[in-house]
UniProtKB/Swiss-Prot annotation:
GO terms for biological process: defense response; neuropeptide signaling pathway. Residues 1-20 form the signal peptide. This is Prolevitide. GO terms for cellular component: extracellular region. Expressed by the skin glands. It comes from Xenopus laevis (African clawed frog). Belongs to the gastrin/cholecystokinin family. The modification Pyrrolidone carboxylic acid is found at Q74. The keyword ATP-binding does not apply. One of its GO terms (molecular function) is hormone activity.
């Protein structure tokens, strides 16, 4: 009886051990593809980030200049700076 249980457990351990290890051929191919895709994805992400940063700066700069010009035209810059000088 114990011999049968021992053989059953031994067989289960051997099967589980061999199933846990993937074949080396398939694993190497997957790793190579993952590295290739991961490399391209990070480069694309960095490039898109730089483009977005430059684009946002280009969009925001004219708005700032327009706001400053309108504030100067309305005479608000002098009042705003004088209030800051008095507070400081």
């Amino acid at each position: 009886m114990y011999k049968g249980i021992f053989l059953c457990v031994l067989f289960a351990v051997i099967c589980a051990n061999s199933l846990a290890k993937p074949s080396s051929d398939a694993d190497e191919d997957n790793d190579e593809v993952e590295r290739y895709v991961r490399g391209w994805a990070s480069k694309i992400g960095q490039t898109l980030g730089k483009i977005a940063k430059v684009g946002l700066q280009g969009l925001m700069q004219p708005k700032r200049e327009a706001m400053l010009r309108s504030a100067e035209a309305q005479g608000m810059i002098g009042t705003l700076t004088s209030k800051r000088i008095k507070q400081g």
